[in-house]
Amino acid sequence: MRISILALVVALAGCGATLQTYDRLTQESDREIMTHVGGQVLKVKRTTDLPNAFGNADIFGGKVDRGFTELRFQGIAQDGRAVFRVTEIETQSTETTMSRYGGSKSKMDAQLIGNRMSGTVTTYDAPRGSTEMLPPNTTQFAIDLNKSKEFTVAGVKVRVLAVTETSLTYVLQR
């Protein structure tokens, strides 16, 4: 009986889908948006499933931050091209279900001999997980809007509707 319960617990603990990456656009798509020089055009946040002890996805839906891609409007160059800056930030994480949900456990053993007592306390702390940001990867580029008013960054299509020296009007399409 105990062996079958143990086997069931181990089988259920290994449950969970394989780890997946999720991209979330922070702006609304399919709607006209306006920004200023230096303003954010789009931001795509990336997360992955929190891994469990077996390397599968956390059954409680925990996520780990994996960074983002951001596009900013930088203005118009001397030759009339629209200038943009794309920044990619990635993270490295050692977080798992054990580090996020695990707690500390203490065990105390005491022994009474006559009128004296002695004992030991043993404490186990769950491993600590950490997520650190890697240095940003930033690239600036210019687009001739007379040739093309559309381009794609991080899987999101940017369609430029109007541009001035100080503003950009556009639509994002997923």
Each language-model region and where it sits:
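Sec-dependent bacterial lipoprotein signal peptides
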Residues: 1-15
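Mixed-charge, low-complexity intrinsically disordered regions
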Residues: 15-154, 165-174
